[in-house]
C-alpha cells in the first residue's frame, strides 16, 4: 500500500485534493492511501515566508514529510488580480489580516476593485504542488493557472475563498457568466488551476510510482 500525506489544514482545499486523488491506484494495482494533518494529533503550521507559490508549497511539503517520515504533498495557491498589481497573490488566505474570514476577504477585494472597469478586471488562480520525500527533498513540483475575470458581486453557492467572484475564461461567455461557485465540482475540476495541477501530478505518479516510495 502506498501512503501520501496532504499538508493542508484547509478542509475545503483538502476535500478538492481528496476528490481528485481518491481511488487512485498505481500501475501495479497498489491503492493510494491518503493521510491528513488531522491524524497528527497536534497542530501543523508552517510559516509561509517565500515570495511565491512554489516556494511556500515546498516549505509545507518538506516540513510534513520530515515530521511524518513519509512522502508528503503540499498545495500553495491563490488569486492574482492584474489591476491590483498581482494582489492578493501569496497572501490570498490572509488578505486583510487575521480578523477576516473567506467572505470578509472577498468583500475587501471587491471593494478595492470598485473603480476598475469591466475590461480591466482580469485575474488568475495559481496552484503550485510540491511532492517531497521523507528527508524533505523535492521529488516533483508542478504549477498550473486558470485565467479569468472578476465580477462586481459574488454569486453561486459552491466553492470557497474567492470562487464566488471569479469567472474562468472558459465560462465567461455564459449568460450570466458562471463563477467557480456556480459550477459543480466535476465541472470546476476540468478548468481550475488545482484540477490541472493534480492531473499532471497523477500522470507523473502513474508513470513513476517510485515517487511515492518512503
Protein language model annotation of sequence segments:
Residues 2-5, 11-35, 39-214:
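Anionic-ligand binding patches
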